[in-house]
Amino acid sequence: MKILRVESHLLSYPLAEPLKLYYYGGERTILKRDAMLIRVVTDTGLVGYAPGEGSEKAKNGIESGIAPFLQGRALADPDALRVHFMEGPGRDAELARLYGAVEIALYDLLGKARGVPVSELIGGRVRDHIRLYGSAGMYMSPEKYAEEARAIAALGFRAYKLRSGIGPEQDLETIRLIREAVGPDFDLMVDAHTWWRMGDRNYVAATIDRLAESLAEYNVAWLEEPLPPDDHEAYRRLKELDHVPIASGEHEPDEEHYLDLIRSGAVDYVQMDIVCQGGYPTARRLFAEIGRGGLRFAFHSWGTALEVLAAAQLGICWPESVVEWLEYPCYSTPSTAGMYPFPLAAEVLKTPLEIDHGYLMVPRGPGLGIDVDETVLKRYPWIPGPWSFFQIDSPREVRSVTSDHSQPWHEQVSQSRDQREPNP
């Protein structure tokens, strides 16, 4: 079986109207959501699929640096292909990072060819399900957060993650109301997403310490990224206060930084997105280190159901004592609560994911286990431009976001807030 083509398709879902969300230091506007579907086509007619970063930068890297390397090569051993790639084009750090997403499609192909699920190619499953947390909650009133948490619990989830940042006192009121709404046996995660430090009007260190201490009263499962993600020493100091478990990792640039995060005593939960942070091999090495360190792992997943599925195939190869959680983004539909509509996220799969009492039941079919619906390629054409903007009160500026992880949050494109807001 030889690889004929490697394709990266950018997709977009535009919101009917821009969604404006107000936080402590300004306003966020969401215009659309983007995604990437990777296709690897072989001479046997089999096609492998993978999720990718929804950015032109990622597409250009795949098409110029990864596709030429893979085209014409036999697909029998993805690990051997990786070694050759890292000795050649993969010496470029950005291409090495992007290769992890394409590699998921290679495993999907190999699983289909051999008639086994991807999990059997990357260690072997030790369980058939993985615990999910419903992830939504973005910049609302405390009452709206509580209403959404109740709705997500009604969908069968037993955990809810929210993005806080509407002001310290309002954040605490939000957690109080959510805990009242869902009861004591429901897990809550608070994601500060480093935005507590965006602009001049931010949460200073003393405020963050006080919030962490107050959150302990409500039995919060973790506090995520309350500080700049590259400051591991600051995380270690906060963790030493032992108020609430601390989580971080989705912005680590490479494996070396991950190892420092794990070994420095900075966090209780390590997070990683397999689409944009090294793929299966990197995650497997980190899982071993996390297990030795007595920490826990939680997948970051902020895209489509295909990304959730790809992560789950890996997660079930490790016990829940190491790989505990998988993020499940909850987008809104006419009948369900969520952040905003993003129908592409579910429609990329022909069959819905099976969720039972808050656990994803991981399919045993060949490859990733669920067929991709290629009609999304025509139904959701790419729309160039940023998908979101942060309008910061002080200093007055707008920061555009081109994809969740295409560039560090503190290096986003900036322009004067006094300028007219750009169109997508």
Where on the chain are the PLM-derived regions?
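Motif-centric detector for short Cys/His coordination patterns
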Residues: M1-L37, S55-A58, A67-A74
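Conserved, mostly hydrophobic/aromatic
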Residues: I3, G45, I66, V102, ...
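Flexible C-terminal active-site loop/helix
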Residues: L4-K20, T29-I30, T304-A305, L309-P424
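Metal- or metallocofactor-binding catalytic centers and their adjacent structured scaffolds
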Residues: E7, V41-A113, S332-T336, V401-N423
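Short beta-strand elements
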Residues: M36-T42, P352-I355
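Glycine-rich, aromatic-flanked loop segments that form ligand/cofactor-binding clefts
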Residues: V41, E103-Y139, E173, D185
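Shared catalytic-loop signature of beta/alpha-barrel
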Residues: N60, N219, D230-A247, E252-Y359, ...
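Metal-dependent enolase-superfamily TIM-barrel catalytic cores that perform enediolate-based chemistry
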Residues: D128-D242, P424
